[in-house]
Amino acid sequence: MAKIIAINAGSSSLKFQLLAMPEETVIAKGLVERIGLKKSIFTIEANGQQHELTEDIPDHAAAVKLLLKDLTGRGIIASLEEIEGIGHRVVHGGEKFNDSVVITDEVLQGIEEVSELAPLHNPANITGIKAFKEVLPNVPAVAVFDTAFHQTMPESAFLYSLPYEYYEKYGIRKYGFHGTSHKYVTHRAAELMETPIEELRILSCHLGNGASIAAVKGGKSIDTSMGFTPLAGVTMGTRSGNIDPALIPYIMEKTGQSVEEVVATLNKKSGLLGITGFSSDLRDIEAAAKEGDERAQVALDVFASRIHKYVGSYAARMGGLDAIVFTAGIGENSATIRERVLKGLSFMGVDVDLEKNNVRGKEAFIEKAGAPVKIIVIPTNEEVMIARDTVRLTS
């Protein structure tokens, strides 16, 4: 039994899971928050118990030391030698990385080179990698990229209709995100359908505060809704999704905002929050809509209709559809959104069973009996995907 740590490092946080492989069982999981600030918070859950500790954690290396000390101190692992691999989530791999990869100095340099494509995330991911390298220098580490799964997209999907030299010189193209999640749920769908993934055309809907749709044909991503950044595509919690690019100078002119301020508005004050004016949380919006709040109802309509359009579009891209998968916070838990997204698609063989659809947070087939297209709710598990890739590349 191999023990693998899956890591997701943020600028002031470190999310972790210790997994037993190949069983894929979680031994411990937790989070370090407020790294570099006063009163950092360390939370760990193991053996059915949760422990919380508040102390100053100056940097990610200190967070890693505290985590490892806690794992051994509580007897969760007998010694650090039990850890056979570390898998790091890295948001952006650019065109350089089309698969997960064992981290070497050269790889780390490559991740740093593409950091300008994800300035908010990659530097934090790199900090996490370096922190573990400092504390566990002899344990192999693997980088698992959110963008890698979408590197199979053809040029017809990833190129923008801009001067071609922008792509050649600056790497301006569609990259797509949530790749680790889309990969996990589409492979899981194939298992549940007892059909080789090579034979399937799957539409994957990762719907959380960030949301993206992927067309996965034969196990490969051939198109996805997010673009050069995670701002593109469908309406999200606080992100606008696709808009007319000419709106940016227009908004600047009307509001007096700078380009940076407009981009911040598109990222943090738009989407469901922008339309409702009160929340980016779908649960709040559904509750308000039930009580007759018109803007909440409009927000739900906009959110669902943007996703609905991709179902038809990507079914056309794949030459048909065998399954639709819903995952992430909203996809797994909101029967209302699933129903709205799938409404009126029976002409395509997509027919949701309203009774079966009344499911939250667990695997379930929710299509009507005999419907040609399977509709499946699958809770995502990016950590398991990270651990699988770590084992695949280090064993």
Curated annotation (Swiss-Prot):
PANTHER family: ACETATE KINASE (PTHR21060), ACETATE KINASE-RELATED (PTHR21060:SF15). ATP binds at residues 15, 206-210, 281-283, 329-333. Its cofactor is Mg(2+); Mn(2+). The keyword Membrane does not apply. InterPro entries: Ac/propionate_kinase, Aliphatic_acid_kin_short-chain, Aliphatic_acid_kinase_CS, ATPase_NBD. It catalyses: acetate + ATP = acetyl phosphate + ADP. Substrate binds at residue 89. This is Acetate kinase. Pathway: Metabolic intermediate biosynthesis; acetyl-CoA biosynthesis; acetyl-CoA from acetate: step 1/2. Belongs to the acetokinase family. The active site is at 146 (proton donor/acceptor). Keywords: ATP-binding, Cytoplasm, Kinase, Magnesium, Metal-binding, Nucleotide-binding, Transferase.
